[in-house]
């Protein structure tokens, strides 16, 4: 069973259209932070803030190799 705090984090993450678009992009394939930021008028730092919200909700996972951060969808909390 999902606890209310986890559910609140998921709904908060999904409440923003930019984060929903990022999840849509990640549903197609893993992407770097730069690739996720490119379609929007936001900086890499701004994209990183959105990614942190998605990570805290458990919706994505981030892999770091050197300076490259690659994100992938983790739909577990939605099941």
Regions found by a protein language model. Name each.
Residues 55-63:
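Residue cluster at the C-terminal edge of the helix-turn-helix DNA-binding motif
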């Amino acid at each position: 069973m999902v606890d209310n705090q986890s559910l609140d984090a998921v709904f908060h993450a999904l409440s923003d259209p930019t984060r929903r678009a990022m999840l849509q992009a990640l549903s197609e394939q893993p992407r770097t932070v730069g690739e996720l930021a490119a379609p929007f008028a936001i900086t890499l730092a701004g994209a990183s803030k959105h990614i942190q919200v998605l990570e805290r909700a458990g919706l994505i996972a981030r892999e770091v190799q050197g300076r490259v951060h690659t994100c992938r969808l983790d739909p577990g909390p939605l099941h």
